[in-house]
Every structure is written in C-alpha cells, then in structure tokens.
C-alpha cells in the first residue's frame, strides 16, 4: 500500500514510525516548512516529522499551501493509495482529499465531535474533562467532521498534564492507525458518522490564556496549569526576596485554605484562589529549569503572587 504521510509535530512521529515499521511504503512525507529559530531567528529548524522522514530516506515536501494547481498535481503524481494526516497544520482542499485511491484518514486526539480543531489535548484538560481519547476518521471538507473508523478512550486523571496525555494519545494513535490500515487493506474498515450533538471546538491556545488569573476557582486554575504544561506553560508574577519575577507553573495540586486571591497561605506555596486554593508543585524561573516547589523555595522567600 502506497502511503503519503502528512504531519508536523512530535505527536505525529510515533504514528509515522509505526507505519514504516509495519512495512507500508511511505512514498512521501508532507510537513510544515522549516521555521526560524535561535535568538535572532537566523537558524531554520525542521519539524520532527521532517527529521524522522529523512532518517528513513522518505522524500519530504514542505509547501506553505495546497490550494494551488501545481501543488495538487505534484500530490496526485504520487499515486498514493491513502494519505494519513496527523497534526499537519494545513487544510486539505477537495482535490487533495480526492487524490488517494482510498481517501485521507486523520488521527485526532479527542472523542469527536467534542474538541474539533487545533488544541484538543489542552482544551480537554483545561475544561476539566474526565476522559478523552484518540480517533481515526476519514476526512471530508469540514473541520474534523468526517466519519469515524476507530476510537479508544483514555481517562484523564486529576493531576495529569497535557504533556503526559500527549504522549499517551500519540502511542495509542500509532496502534489505532496500524489497525485502521490493516482493515483498509482487507476492505473491512467500517465508518460511523459523528454525533450531531455535543460539538465543541478546541481553538488554538492564545498566549494571553497562559497568565493565571487567581480570582478564578481553584479547580479552574489547576486545570489551566496542567492543561498548559509543558507548552506554552502557565505563568504568573511572584514577589521573590522583594523583587517581582515571572515564573512558569508546570505542576500543581488542589490545596486547602482560603484568602484573598494570590495570597501565599503557607511555606509550601499554597496559593489562595477566588474559591479554594492551589498548591504549586513544579515551577520554573526565567532561564532556569523546572524545579519541585521545595527546591524552588530553597533560599527564597515568596511573599506575593500576582
């Protein structure tokens, strides 16, 4: 089976690796173009999928759009049986969707129709969902609206971070995709339309959302911290030894106590919220590495959280 793989971030890599490892012929990899990196933006960084594809000698394409006739002709010339799309980052026009003999299949990190869109892992945790999952769907022209081929649910534990859920769903996605490809080969892949009820959208994370609002209930603050960990990272300003610093918050738990929002309630960094309190467990100063709260506090006095 001739496969075109379309993906960009680290989340996509285990799925690409599994497809290669199971002997499928990956004739091309499509990914986002290299991005400027470094302090001055003078270096170009290739995506994780780009790096992995080149390791296996797979031709890599990095168009900025697939809407043009030239790019669509190049894609069609690959004569793919199927395209596998996992966090690619570009919309696929109808000409691309129709080109592979068996269609295009997407690995999506939510239980559709909940959390269609760009940031389903973060949004599920930030909303306090108790479960999510991984789905394989056949793509149509809508935003994550196609019929579902396979799904697996995953419990979201109370302190699970987006990074932990990301890694879990990526591995599940690799297994599901291999099963889906096998069923496609056997012509036994059954498709079920998505439910019409329960549609929500996982908008891309805005940088402004990363600043913690201590006037919110503790459960919302905790969900924001873990939902934005490790990237982009929730943050706040702290008065440390009399100076105000910006600090990233990587882990937390629900704490006990109450007070004016932002009040430091004890020497274990329990912070009062609009309702209840949150205990900060892992923090990161600018230019530093993430540290457990006890180590973060060594020789430091936090008097205020803003």
Curated annotation (Swiss-Prot):
Does the entry feature the keyword Transport, yes or no?
no
Q: Can you supply one Gene Ontology CC term for this chain's record?
A: cytosol
Please report a single Pfam family linked to this protein.
Formyl_trans_N
EC number assigned by the record: 2.1.2.9
Q: Per the record's keyword annotation, is Membrane included, yes or no? A: no
Under the heading CDD domains, the entry gives: FMT_core_Met-tRNA-FMT_N, Met_tRNA_FMT_C
Q: Which residues bind (6S)-5,6,7,8-tetrahydrofolate?
A: 110-113
What Gene Ontology terms describe what this protein does at the molecular function level? Answer: methionyl-tRNA formyltransferase activity
Which catalysed reactions does the entry list for this protein?
Answer: L-methionyl-tRNA(fMet) + (6R)-10-formyltetrahydrofolate = N-formyl-L-methionyl-tRNA(fMet) + (6S)-5,6,7,8-tetrahydrofolate + H(+)
Q: Which domain of life is it from?
A: Bacteria
Task: Print the keywords alphabetically.
Answer: Protein biosynthesis, Transferase
Q: What class of enzyme is it?
A: transferase
Q: Which InterPro entries match?
A: Fmt (IPR005794), Formyl_trans_C (IPR005793), Formyl_trans_C_sf (IPR037022), Formyl_transf_N (IPR002376), Formyl_transf_N_sf (IPR036477), Formyl_transferase-like_C_sf (IPR011034), GART_AS (IPR001555), Met-tRNA-FMT_C (IPR044135)
* Family recorded in the similarity comment: Belongs to the Fmt family.
The task this protein performs is described as:
Attaches a formyl group to the free amino group of methionyl-tRNA(fMet). The formyl group appears to play a dual role in the initiator identity of N-formylmethionyl-tRNA by promoting its recognition by IF2 and preventing the misappropriation of this tRNA by the elongation apparatus.
Q: What is this protein called?
A: Methionyl-tRNA formyltransferase
